């Protein structure tokens, strides 16, 4: 079953894949990395001007990485928000996804966290660098195939 946004995207010739609805009835769509930036701009113009959250996860050991965007559109009143979940999958070897920082400024720290924890590079992000881990940290701690070091260095806060 396709939701309203999926039908609208098909009507306008925009390539995507419907992933159905989540437990709250929010439509979930898959967008290819190469199509994501242009579709993100179109969604913003269409009224999805609020990026509620962005996160990322490792789909399976050795598999794809996913960047997830929760967008909100308020057309008929604050009590009737229209929400959509967008998933963009990237290959593990070279995970590159266009940054949406220039569309939704709230993506800044969220994309940086996804980079820091999973190693997803967000093309054209103005400050893509580690945000939680030290710059010298090797690896991506939230990947399912990450091997944690058997030591932990405690640094003085001063």
From Swiss-Prot:
- Tell me the keywords, alphabetical order: Chloroplast, Membrane, NAD, NADP, Plastid, Plastoquinone, Quinone, Thylakoid, Translocase, Transport
Q: GO terms for biological process? A: photosynthesis, light reaction
Instruction: List the transmembrane segments.
Output: none
Say which domain of life the source belongs to.
Eukaryota
- One Pfam family in the UniProt entry: Complex1_30kDa
**What GO MF terms are annotated?**
NADH dehydrogenase (ubiquinone) activity; quinone binding
Recorded GO CC terms: chloroplast thylakoid membrane
Task: Write down the top EC class of this protein.
Answer: translocase
Keyword Membrane included in the entry's annotation: yes
Q: Which InterPro entries match?
A: NADH_DH_suC, NADH_quin_OxRdtase_su_C/D-like, NADH_UbQ_OxRdtase_30kDa_su, NADH_UbQ_OxRdtase_CS
Q: How does it sit in the membrane?
A: Peripheral membrane protein
Subcellular location per UniProt equals: Plastid, Chloroplast thylakoid membrane
Record field: catalytic activity:
a plastoquinone + NADH + (n+1) H(+)(in) = a plastoquinol + NAD(+) + n H(+)(out); a plastoquinone + NADPH + (n+1) H(+)(in) = a plastoquinol + NADP(+) + n H(+)(out)
Q: What is its EC number?
A: 7.1.1.-
- Function, as annotated: NDH shuttles electrons from NAD(P)H:plastoquinone, via FMN and iron-sulfur (Fe-S) centers, to quinones in the photosynthetic chain and possibly in a chloroplast respiratory chain. The immediate electron acceptor for the enzyme in this species is believed to be plastoquinone. Couples the redox reaction to proton translocation, and thus conserves the redox energy in a proton gradient.
Report quaternary structure and partners: NDH is composed of at least 16 different subunits, 5 of which are encoded in the nucleus.
Family as reported in the entry's similarity comment: Belongs to the complex I 30 kDa subunit family.
Name of the protein in question: NAD(P)H-quinone oxidoreductase subunit J, chloroplastic
Q: Which organism is it from?
A: Morus indica
């Amino acid at each position: 079953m396709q939701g309203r946004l999926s039908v609208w995207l098909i009507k306008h010739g925009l390539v995507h894949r419907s992933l159905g609805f989540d437990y709250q009835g929010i439509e979930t769509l898959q967008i290819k990395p190469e199509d994501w930036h242009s579709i993100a701009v179109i969604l913003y113009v269409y009224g999805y001007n609020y990026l509620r959250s962005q996160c990322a996860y490792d789909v399976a050991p050795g598999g794809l990485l996913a960047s997830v965007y929760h967008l909100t559109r308020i057309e008929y009143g604050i009590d009737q928000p229209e929400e959509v979940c967008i998933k963009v999958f990237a290959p593990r070897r070279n995970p590159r996804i266009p940054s949406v920082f220039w569309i939704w400024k709230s993506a800044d720290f969220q994309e940086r966290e996804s980079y820091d924890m999973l190693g997803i590079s967000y093309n054209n992000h103005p400050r893509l660098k580690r945000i939680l881990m030290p710059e010298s940290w090797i690896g991506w701690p939230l990947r399912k195939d990450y091997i944690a070091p058997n030591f932990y260095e405690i640094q003085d806060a001063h």
